[in-house]
């Protein structure tokens, strides 16, 4: 389910990126590493993200240094626990999702000899329909996020962002919640094995939520209250050949969410998530993806739950 936390961005596998080099301390950081980490992809539940495998646009072809990209995707999957409730109350469901994303990257801003500021703007719309509990769960979600990254030597990156997101129930048309969320992230990339790339990501964010509906099944929009969230994740990008047509992306993550306002004050949630995506670039601008994810949440206030999702996705992307 969408939440006040915006989708975290993950690195993109790009041409000749299968043998990534850490920038020596005597060299300037570049947009290349930041682009690897921030290209939009399909936002998946369980915080597993499908990266775009579109080769980067030649900077010389961009208008005055600006780079723009659009992406759209369809996903169909099965979930073992549609209401995110305790095991005895689990209910299975099929889910269909559609989304559209657009991103604008501004020209690099050099800061001294070794640092580069990387401003960007991201927008996303997502729709979901559920086989079960559709009147309660079908949603329309919108997100706009502005941010700036600081690319540093040796594949270190800092990120600062502010996003606004809003969720509506499709059946009733009513707003479920909206929120403002500032965030800070730290990322580090590593070249591993022969062609693979491993990324460590740590993120802290504060969500200020205006919730207009409260559901009896608390696991449905579990983090739709004012909260502070800290998360860490490891993501591995491994291509099966030098062209990158077939890529597997396993990921594990852990988040801690602390609620600080009524009616959720003093609530503390821990969410473990893991999963993998297998992406095949079958045409120049189109990807086919198979994915699965597992999530397990423990809380001192609401019911603990586990959920397993598996499905297929089709995405298309284009860069200007």
Where are these regions (language model features)?
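N-terminal periplasmic/intermembrane-space "pro-region" immediately following the signal or transit peptide
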Residues: 1-71
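Transmembrane beta-strand segments of Gram-negative outer membrane beta-barrel proteins
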Residues: 60-80, 118-121
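Membrane-embedded beta-strand positions of outer-membrane beta-barrel proteins
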Residues: 70-72, 119-123, 146, 158-162, ...
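Transmembrane beta-strands of outer-membrane beta-barrel pores
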Residues: 74-82, 104-106, 123-131, 162-170, ...
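Surface-exposed strand-loop-strand hairpins of Gram-negative outer-membrane beta-barrel proteins
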Residues: 75-100, 132-134
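Repeated loop/turn-to-beta-strand initiation elements of outer-membrane beta-barrel proteins
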Residues: 108-120, 153-160, 190-200, 241-248, ...
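Outer-membrane beta-barrel "beta-signal"
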Residues: 291, 306-320
């Amino acid at each position: 389910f969408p939440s006040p936390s915006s989708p975290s961005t993950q690195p993109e596998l790009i041409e000749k990126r299968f043998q990534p080099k850490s920038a020596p301390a005597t060299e300037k950081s570049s947009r290349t590493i930041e682009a690897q980490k921030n290209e939009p992809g399909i936002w998946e539940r369980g915080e597993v993200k499908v990266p775009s495998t579109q080769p980067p646009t030649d900077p010389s072809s961009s208008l005055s240094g600006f780079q723009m990209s659009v992406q759209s995707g369809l996903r169909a999957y099965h979930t073992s626990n549609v209401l995110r409730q305790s095991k005895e109350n689990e209910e299975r469901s099929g889910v269909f999702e559609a989304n559209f994303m657009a991103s604008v990257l501004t020209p690099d801003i050099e800061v001294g000899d070794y640092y580069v500021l990387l401003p960007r703007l991201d927008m996303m719309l997502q729709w979901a329909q559920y086989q079960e509990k559709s009147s309660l769960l079908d949603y329309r979600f919108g997100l706009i996020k502005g941010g700036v990254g600081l690319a540093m030597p040796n594949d270190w990156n800092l990120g600062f962002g502010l996003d606004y997101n809003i969720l509506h129930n499709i059946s009733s048309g009513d707003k479920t919640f909206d929120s403002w969320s500032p965030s800070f992230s730290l990322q580090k990339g590593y070249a591993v094995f022969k062609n693979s790339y491993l990324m460590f990501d740590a993120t802290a964010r504060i969500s200020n939520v205006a919730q207009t509906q409260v559901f009896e099944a608390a696991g449905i929009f579990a983090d739709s209250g004012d909260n502070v969230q800290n998360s860490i994740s490891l993501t591995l990008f491994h291509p099966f050949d030098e062209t990158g047509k077939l890529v597997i992306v396993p990921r594990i993550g852990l988040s801690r969410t602390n609620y600080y306002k009524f009616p959720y004050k003093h609530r503390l949630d821990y969410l473990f998530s893991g999963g993998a995506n297998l992406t095949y670039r079958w045409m120049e601008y189109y990807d086919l993806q198979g994915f699965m994810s597992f999530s397990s949440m423990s809380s001192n206030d609401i019911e603990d739950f586990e959920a397993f999702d598996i499905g297929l996705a089709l995405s298309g992307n284009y860069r200007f």
